[in-house]
């Protein structure tokens, strides 16, 4: 016998074990996405415009120090060579910063239950956080491009737009996934800072943003080619300049596919961690 409601109807509940929401919880997924987006938009001076200003300073310093007397790299002025790498580097670093803070802040503030209790599957939770991180990366990329465009002598004309879009998204997604993994593992903000300072920052700065690896010793060239950030930055730069130090076109396409595979593997690993509840529910 089912209890009657005030309107004379009946309140019917699904049998135990039968899901009420079938398929993707679109409303919950969108709500999580908007929560994460609004979180970084509330402090957009710090999360979007500050990275643009910092990146512009990088461009000014390195251009003044290394780009004098009309120096050219890959057939273009030094400033135009450095600019694409700075843009995508800022995108990746901010994608990591956004997703690495999502779950960690809940752990530290005791509000992690607000993310775990809603009827969101591990895949939906992961998708919402990663989508917001990529959104911030795109916003930062546009802000950085706008700031860099103010510097004289920089050309941001795109030769291969598909490469700009593909490598920009793959790089942002790569760092967003790594950030989410860090957010699951970290137990305090010091852990997150350690990953940022000792892993993400070195990989970013040693990825060929400010130089071509052909000028390095063969051993360091080999080490650089083991760095996935190198392929993101070189591919992104290829989209603007039509040239890169990665190698022939076959290497470029292999890098594009390789980044997709790497992202898929990392995403599968992070999904498994979320599903197990490791360091979240225990």
Label each residue range with its predicted role.
Residues 2-162, 166-282:
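Hydrophobic transmembrane alpha-helices and immediately adjacent juxtamembrane helices
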């Amino acid at each position: 016998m089912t209890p009657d409601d005030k309107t004379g109807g009946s309140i019917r509940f699904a049998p135990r074990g039968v899901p009420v929401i079938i398929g993707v919880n679109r409303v919950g997924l969108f709500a999580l996405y908007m929560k994460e987006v609004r979180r970084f938009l509330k402090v957009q001076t710090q999360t979007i415009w500050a990275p643009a200003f910092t990146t512009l300073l990088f461009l000014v310093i390195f251009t003044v120090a290394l780009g004098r007397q009309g120096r050219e790299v890959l057939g273009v002025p030094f400033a135009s060579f450095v600019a694409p790498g700075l843009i995508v580097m800022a995108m990746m670093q901010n994608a990591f910063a956004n997703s690495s803070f999502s779950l960690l802040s809940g752990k530290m503030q005791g509000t992690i239950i607000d993310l775990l209790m809603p009827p969101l599957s591990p895949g939906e939770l992961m998708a919402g956080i990663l989508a917001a991180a990529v959104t911030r990366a795109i916003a930062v990329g546009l802000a950085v491009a706008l700031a860099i465009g103010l510097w004289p002598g920089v050309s941001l004309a795109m030769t291969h737009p598909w490469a700009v879009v593909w490598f920009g998204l793959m790089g942002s997604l790569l760092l967003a996934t790594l950030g989410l993994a860090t957010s699951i593992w970290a137990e305090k903000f010091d852990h997150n800072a350690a990953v940022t300072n000792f892993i993400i920052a070195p990989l970013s700065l040693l990825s060929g943003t400010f130089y071509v690896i052909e000028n390095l010793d063969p051993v360091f060239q080999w080490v650089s080619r083991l760095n996935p950030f190198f392929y993101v930055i070189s591919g992104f730069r290829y989209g603007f300049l039509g040239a890169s130090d990665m190698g022939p076109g076959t290497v470029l396409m292999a890098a594009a596919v390789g980044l997709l595979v790497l992202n898929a593997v990392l995403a599968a690993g992070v999904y498994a961690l979320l599903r197990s509840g490791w360091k979240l529910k225990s």
